[in-house]
Structures are given as C-alpha cells and as structure tokens.
C-alpha cells in the first residue's frame, strides 16, 4: 500500500506543478487571442507615395496636366476605393496588454487591454484578474501540501490529513481558474464589438496562451481527482487491513442452548459438584467435536495455551462451566 500511495502522490504533484507552470505562463503572456485588424492605408499626406496620383510613371504624364485639386485643409487623400483602401495588420492580446504590429516597421505597439475594455466590462475584467491570481495562489498551496505529504509518507494518518487538504485546495483552484477564463473570454468578445474603432479586430481566434490556460485547468482537475482517488483508496485499504486484523483476533461466536444452561444450573444447585469437570470437558467436546477432543496426557491441538483459555471463556456461563 505504501508504494502505490507514494506513486499516486508523485503523479498528483507532477500534474499540479504542470498546471502551475501553464497558469503562470498564460497569465503573463499576451497571446490569449490573436488575429488581424483592418486599418486605412496611409494617404498622400502621410508619405504614401504609391497612393498618390503623381507617383511613379504618372508623374511625368501629369506634369503638363492641370494640377489636381488638393483636399481641403491639406488632409491626406487616396484614389483607391472599397477594400483597397485598407490593409490588415496582426495583433495579439492578453490579460494585461494588447499589441499591434507597426505598419512599415518591425516593431509592435502595445497598450493596456484594461483601457480598451468598455466601461461596463471593466469590473468583470478586474474580477477575472483577481480570480486568476487566486487560482495561481491556491495551486501553490496545493502543491506545497502535496510535497509535505511526500515527506510524511511514512505516517498514514498525517498523509491522509495532508492529502485531504491538498485535494480541497486543488479543487477550489480549478473552479476559480475556470471562472476566470470564462470571464476573460466574455470581456474580450464584448470588447470586439464595443471597443475602440481603431482596435476592433477584422478576424480573430484564440492563441496559445488561451490553450495553456485551459491546459492548466485540465491538469489542475486531474491532480485533484488523483489526490481524491489516493485519499479514498488509502482509506479503503486502511479500513480493509484493520478489518482483517480484527477478524484474526475475533472470538468465534458462542451458541449456548438455554435449556442446557438451565439443566447444568439445576445440577449444580443440587450439589452435584463432582461432575463440574465432566461438564467442562463435555462442553469442550460438544463445542469442537473433531479438533478439540480432550485426551488424557495430551496437549490441545493448534498449540494452545491461548486457545485453551479461549475455550474456557466460551464455556464459562453465569459463574459455572457450561
């Protein structure tokens, strides 16, 4: 039982550690959701020479033509129409930040996702953040208790207590993690519809941080189930061994005929004490007709000072041998 219990404890510790690593990584990264955003192309006034009517080969042809009317107040303009006026840029978002790639450059521009969320959803987002933090803290507590259980593996009672507390903390952390992930998903979907115009995604999907978060939840629940299973199996094995141990020392049931008790009591009250030993031997003989028949000068079978005392207890009723 000790080896199997230690093996189950090691499995629970490994699953809990994996859940903790996944949860911490997902909490600190910005790839919960990723996709593309549709943004306008730069106009002529913003350095977009390719979009200007006088760029390239058209510049010579248009040099003798009438000048093109400029847009009012020098605002940028573009001759493209429809979807050609837009281009797609990639973005990725986490709990803390949302980052978009820079157009025409290798870098990224990041801004706080909490600021991007609608005012009606900021409370839910903060609740999600708090739940994620509690989720990680409870995972740490459960992991510590499981490690203590491994240290106290020689003591069954102490191990069971630590096992029970570790299972409770792990289950609670899993529930908090599930609620936190679902709340963040809800906030992101609302932000997609009601967020700032310059941020709203054209298309999006869940990223690897989101997969890590739910993988952490899966490992956490697997660790809790393993811990509960270890606790249950240890209790059942312990009770079974105790039951077998008690049955090994339990006295066999004694069935005494009330009429025989009355008969022996009347004989003794008449003063026929000389037959008391015969009554005792008869009791032994009747009780164990094959295994324990007394023989003069012989010892009892099954080796037996202890068993002889047991027979005496079984035949002694109301102060007399019966």
UniProtKB/Swiss-Prot annotation:
Compartments, record wording: Cell membrane; Synapse
Sequence ranges on the Cytoplasmic membrane side: 1-8, 144-163, 229-322
Membrane topology of this protein: Multi-pass membrane protein
Annotated GO CC locations: asymmetric synapse; glutamatergic synapse; postsynaptic density membrane; Schaffer collateral - CA1 synapse
Main location: membrane
Transmembrane segments: 9-29, 123-143, 164-184, 208-228
GO biological process: regulation of postsynaptic neurotransmitter receptor internalization; regulation of short-term neuronal synaptic plasticity; synapse organization; transmission of nerve impulse
Extracellular side: 30-122, 185-207
Family: Belongs to the GSG1 family.
Protein name: Germ cell-specific gene 1-like protein
Originating organism: Mus musculus
């Amino acid at each position: 039982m000790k080896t199997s219990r230690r093996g189950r404890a090691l499995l629970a510790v490994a699953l809990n550690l994996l859940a903790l690593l996944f949860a911490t990584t997902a909490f600190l990264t910005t790839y919960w959701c990723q996709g593309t955003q549709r943004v306008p192309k730069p106009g002529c006034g913003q350095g977009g020479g390719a979009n200007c009517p006088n760029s390239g080969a058209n510049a010579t042809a248009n040099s003798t033509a009438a000048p093109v009317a400029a847009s009012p107040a020098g605002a940028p303009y573009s001759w493209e129409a429809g979807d050609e006026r837009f281009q797609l840029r990639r973005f990725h978002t986490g709990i803390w930040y949302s980052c978009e790639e820079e157009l025409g450059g290798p870098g990224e521009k990041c801004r706080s996702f909490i600021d991007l969320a609608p005012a009606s959803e900021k409370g839910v987002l903060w609740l999600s953040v708090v739940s994620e933090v509690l989720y990680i803290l409870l995972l740490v507590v459960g992991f510590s208790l499981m490690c203590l259980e491994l240290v106290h593996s020689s003591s069954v009672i102490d191990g069971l207590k630590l096992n029970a507390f570790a299972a409770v903390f792990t289950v609670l952390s899993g529930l908090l993690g599930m609620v936190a992930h679902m709340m963040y998903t809800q906030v992101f979907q609302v932000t997609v519809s009601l967020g700032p115009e310059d941020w709203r995604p054209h298309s999006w999907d869940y990223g690897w941080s989101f997969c890590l978060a739910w993988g952490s939840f899966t490992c956490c629940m697997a660790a809790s189930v393993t811990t509960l299973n270890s606790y249950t199996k240890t209790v059942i094995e312990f009770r079974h061994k105790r039951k077998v141990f008690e049955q090994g020392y339990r006295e066999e049931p004694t069935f005494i005929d009330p009429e025989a008790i009355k008969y022996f009591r009347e004989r003794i009250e008449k003063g026929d004490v000389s037959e008391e030993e015969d009554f005792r031997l008869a009791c032994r003989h009747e009780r164990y007709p094959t295994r324990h028949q007394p023989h003069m000068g012989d010892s009892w079978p099954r080796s037996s000072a202890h068993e002889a005392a047991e027979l005496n207890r079984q035949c002694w009723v109301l102060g007399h041998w019966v």
